[in-house]
């Protein structure tokens, strides 16, 4: 897990360090800032909001926040976060019929499920 977290911090964190607010289609931490948007032979050819670069979200939710679905359709789950990697975190993740909010303040872990109400 430490290798994965370091990769996320260095690679995707490198995008954030360069001003990204979404995940880019491709990123080379060694590339000069002047060429960071180059791709496909075009100076501004790179997509700056690309779904296939969003894998850290999956890794953080599953492996670090410890959200594991135990039943069909996401209605049953357990939360077993790896708090040892973080000073603190505040994470909200989707689950069936709602979301789960996981907060670690360095001392106390709080987990709360919120249901979406459907008024029909």
PLM region spans:
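Non-catalytic C-terminal accessory modules of carbohydrate-active enzymes
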Residues: 2-120
């Amino acid at each position: 897990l430490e290798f994965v977290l370091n990769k996320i911090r260095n690679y995707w964190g490198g995008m954030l360090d360069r001003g990204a607010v979404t995940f880019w289609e491709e990123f080379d931490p060694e590339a000069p800032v002047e060429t960071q948007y180059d791709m496909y032979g075009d100076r501004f050819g790179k997509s700056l909001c690309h779904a296939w670069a969003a894998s850290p979200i999956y890794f953080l939710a599953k492996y670090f926040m410890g959200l594991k679905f135990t039943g069909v359709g996401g209605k049953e789950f357990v939360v077993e976060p790896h708090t040892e990697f973080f000073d603190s975190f505040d994470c909200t993740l989707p689950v069936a019929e709602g979301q789960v909010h996981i907060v670690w303040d360095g001392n106390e872990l709080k987990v709360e499920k919120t249901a979406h109400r459907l008024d029909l």
